[in-house]
A protein has these predicted regions:
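Generic structural signal for hydrophobic core residues of well-folded globular domains
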Residues: 59-65, 95-99
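Short, structured motif recognition centered on aromatic/hydrophobic residues
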Residues: 52-61, 91-92
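Charged/polar, low-hydrophobicity segments characteristic of intrinsically disordered regions
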Residues: 83-108
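Short helix-capping/linker segments at secondary-structure and domain boundaries
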Residues: 64-71, 101-105
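Acidic, glycine/proline-rich low-complexity segments that act as flexible tails and inter-domain linkers
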Residues: 1-51, 74, 79, 103-133
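Mid-chain, well-packed structural core segment of small domains
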Residues: 66-89
């Protein structure tokens, strides 16, 4: 598919909505399918929001033992303003009961790293310098 096709443009726009960054260059079959089909069609299907689709994906990742991918989605959700620290922690507790405690424990480690980054960013935004006494 050409780089200027409507489907490619939709795929790129959806990737930006999901992850918060632009994909400038699409090269290779796997990336083309990812942009054109997954994000250009699958993420367009129906009327669900990005947040709703993301929550489904997080649940699926947890059920499949892909805590790292779930963590990536949670981090993107925070950066996109869809979830806050309380939401992240609630998701871990909820999924622990369905995906299992060991999987949730792994996800919780990812969540606490994200929450720490959020707190550090808030401190910097507020003018607090963690290096000053």
């Amino acid at each position: 598919m050409s780089d200027d096709s409507p489907q490619r443009a939709t795929g790129k726009a959806n990737m930006k909505a999901v992850y918060g960054w632009d994909i400038d260059h699409v090269e290779g079959s796997f990336v083309e399918y990812t942009v054109d089909h997954l994000f250009g069609r699958v993420w367009e299907e129906g009327s669900m929001s990005v947040k709703e689709r993301r929550l489904l994906l997080i649940g699926l990742c947890m059920g499949s033992g892909l805590e790292d991918v779930a963590g990536l989605q949670l981090d993107a959700a925070v950066r996109q303003g869809e979830l806050d620290a309380d939401d992240l922690r609630s998701i871990v507790v909820f999924l622990a009961h369905y995906a299992g405690w060991p999987r949730a424990a792994k996800l919780n480690m990812e969540v606490e790293k994200i929450v720490a980054r959020m707190a550090a960013a808030t401190d910097v935004d507020a003018g607090d310098d963690p290096d000053l006494p």
